[in-house]
């Protein structure tokens, strides 16, 4: 994926924030090594400011401080940590995270002040949850798929609430989902209420670290609670409510949970919705995987893939090689990006002067 470009004002803010953090860190004393035991391997299951909950090999969870030399630590990181000892006055000393292993993958989101911000690590797949209610939106599904391709993390499309469909509705929705099956995406149709289709979903989640993405109202929390086997008293409460747009942020901490059937999930409202405004137009184009065979074959090198003469993509649409809905959503995404980028430039205009 090509490097995301920031405006001069955004870059100045990123650098200023980083220098401020370094100055604050330098003024603080580091932790006394004598307060901690031997090093162990662990995984970060949640991050709270300057502390992290680390799960050890035996499954126990330890609240840890974070060495000031560690610049980035997120849920899912594999770490080296040391347990705290009891100090002489009987006050329990927290553990400490000493180092972070190299990440197999990192999930990021655009941030107005810090550029592209990591929010979860070592994710194997993003479960894109949609539903027939409040409405089945292929445009939203396509936006999530573009985000997955940009992050280079495999997506799994899960369509929830199929119990609300009659036979004709089910047939229509299956035809819509065939668009994605035919270009290589995995699609599962489930109902968190009746638990139809949950067994195949459990199999797809086993031995993997997953994260659920989807708009409010599609039943993400209901699915997670069913998969985690939680009762009403244990139900996950950090779902996003009254949020309809991509790219919304939240301060609720991400947390890693273990599925009883195997596999893990990182649950966080902050990573369930993705913004695309930080991506280049070429990245959006590349995010439509069925376009790849036709890119570079247009009559003109600067083809915008719209009404340009000799456009290979439009010809593929006309010949039924590319779904018309996907091609239309591609242009909708580009248009929405332009609108958001204009607003972003206005927000930072005072800083650029």
Swiss-Prot record:
Cell membrane found in the keyword field: no
Binding site for Zn(2+): 298, 303, 305, 311
Quaternary structure annotation from Swiss-Prot or TrEMBL: Monomer. Associates with 30S ribosomal subunit, binds 16S rRNA.
Identification of the protein by name: Small ribosomal subunit biogenesis GTPase RsgA
Biased composition (Polar residues): 1-17
Pfam families named among the record's database cross-references: RsgA_GTPase
GO molecular function, one term: GTPase activity
NCBIfam families tied to this protein: PRK12288.1, ribosome small subunit-dependent GTPase A
Cofactor(s) annotated in UniProt: Zn(2+)
Family matches, as SUPFAM superfamilies: P-loop containing nucleoside triphosphate hydrolases
Family recorded in the similarity comment: Belongs to the TRAFAC class YlqF/YawG GTPase family. RsgA subfamily.
Domain CP-type G: 104-274
EC supergroup of this enzyme: hydrolase
GO cellular component: cytoplasm
PROSITE patterns: ENGC_GTPASE, G_CP
């Amino acid at each position: 994926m090509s490097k995301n470009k920031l405006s001069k004002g955004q870059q100045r803010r990123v650098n200023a924030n980083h220098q401020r953090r370094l100055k604050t860190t330098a003024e603080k004393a580091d932790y006394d090594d004598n307060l901690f035991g031997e090093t162990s391997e662990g995984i970060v299951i949640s991050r709270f400011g300057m502390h992290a909950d680390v799960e050890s090999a035996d499954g126990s969870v330890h609240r840890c401080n974070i060495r000031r030399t560690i610049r980035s630590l997120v849920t899912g990181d594999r770490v080296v940590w040391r347990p705290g000892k009891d100090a002489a006055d009987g006050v329990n000393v927290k553990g400490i995270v000493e180092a972070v292993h190299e990440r197999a993958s990192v999930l990021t989101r655009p941030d107005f002040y810090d550029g592209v911000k990591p929010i979860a690590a070592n994710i194997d797949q993003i479960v894109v949850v949609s539903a027939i209610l409040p409405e089945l939106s292929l445009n939203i599904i396509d936006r999530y798929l573009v985000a997955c391709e940009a992050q280079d993390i495999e997506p799994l499309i899960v369509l929830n609430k199929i119990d609300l469909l009659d036979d004709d509705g089910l047939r229509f929705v299956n035809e819509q989902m065939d668009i994605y099956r035919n270009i290589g995406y995995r699609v599962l149709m489930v109902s968190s209420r009746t638990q139809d289709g949950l067994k195949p979903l459990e199999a797809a989640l086993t031995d993997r670290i997953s994260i659920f993405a989807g708009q409010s109202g599609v039943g993400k929390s209901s699915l997670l609670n069913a998969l985690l086997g939680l009762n009403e008293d244990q139900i996950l409460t950090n779902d996003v409510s009254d949020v309809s747009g991509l790219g919304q942020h939240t301060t609720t901490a991400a947390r890693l949970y273990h599925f009883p059937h195997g596999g893990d999930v990182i649950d966080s409202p902050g990573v369930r919705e993705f913004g695309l405004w930080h991506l280049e137009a070429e990245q959006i184009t590349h995010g439509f995987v069925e376009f790849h065979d036709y890119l570079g074959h247009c009559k003109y090198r600067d083809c915008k893939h719209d009404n340009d003469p000799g456009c290979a993509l439009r010809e593929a649409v006309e010949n039924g090689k590319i779904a018309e809905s996907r091609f239309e959503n591609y242009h909708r995404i580009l248009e929405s990006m332009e609108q958001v980028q204009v607003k972003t430039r206005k927000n930072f205009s005072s800083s650029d002067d």
